[in-house]
Amino acid sequence: MTDPLSRAGLVIVDKPAGMTSHDVVSRCRRIFSTRKVGHAGTLDPMATGVLVIGIERATKIMGLLTLTTKSYAATIRFGQSTSTDDAEGEVLQTISASHLTEVDIEAAVAGLRGDIAQVPSSVSAIKVDGQRAYKLAREGQSVELAARPVRISRFDVLAVRGSGEDLIDVDVEIDCSSGTYIRALARDAGAALGVGGHLTALRRTRVGDFGLDRARTLEELADGATLTLDLDSACRQGFPRRDLDAAEVDAVRNGRPLAPAGIEGTYAAVDADDRVIALLADKGSRTTSVVVLRPANL
């Protein structure tokens, strides 16, 4: 019998510039001939790179996967600040950056490494009074967002070069926690240097365990709609494992709890055929089902 979950899994897409993350979801719906498609970790339209897409029943695990670390390659332009903190916004101010040295730039970058409190860009998806901040900002309303803790574990300067008479472009690589706004790092580094700054290029190179080496373009997927990881492989890779006997499999498929496993957090409950039956979590003296992937009625 054909496994009903054979079409479910993860696809790692190399998002092109000019498309929203939802645009990519829409394309994947057509490519994989299903409405059940979702994504984890939004990328701005100007950005390219790794976007994790869930197909069919894999959409149920997207919020559970550990995708808390991200890596980027970016270019920051010093000497101009913009309304969006990137190249798509209106230039608000231009101040000559020609006097800046590599030592100056490294000092500004160093001040943004480690655990910091970051004020997100006003043009962001954060909700303010029930509305997205970017919507309010584009309507001309003043948006004030609270600082939030983020971790910048790597912020390396790769190259410094002139861009015109007064501007300087700096290529950087960044490893950071989920929720970090790279545009805000560009803004804050420019502010620290007293000349303003904004992002001119952004490429996400890694999300969690998924890097560009596993990513495929939409054109490649259109030529062959294959999963990067099927649902079982994604769960076995993304969560601790608990092996079940036949009686335990029957219990889980029918919504009955098991004795706790002593495993911290969410874990994959796997049958003798290496299929993931459910994602479970211990709760006191029993398990609770986080999501049952293969219920009895499937």
UniProtKB/Swiss-Prot annotation:
Primary enzyme class: isomerase
One biological process term in Gene Ontology: mRNA pseudouridine synthesis
Any one GO MF annotation of this record: RNA binding
Residues annotated as the enzyme's active site: D44
Keywords: Isomerase, tRNA processing
Family per record: Belongs to the pseudouridine synthase TruB family. Type 1 subfamily.
Protein name from the UniProt record: tRNA pseudouridine synthase B
Source species: Mycobacteroides abscessus (strain ATCC 19977 / DSM 44196 / CCUG 20993 / CIP 104536 / JCM 13569 / NCTC 13031 / TMC 1543 / L948) (Mycobacterium abscessus)
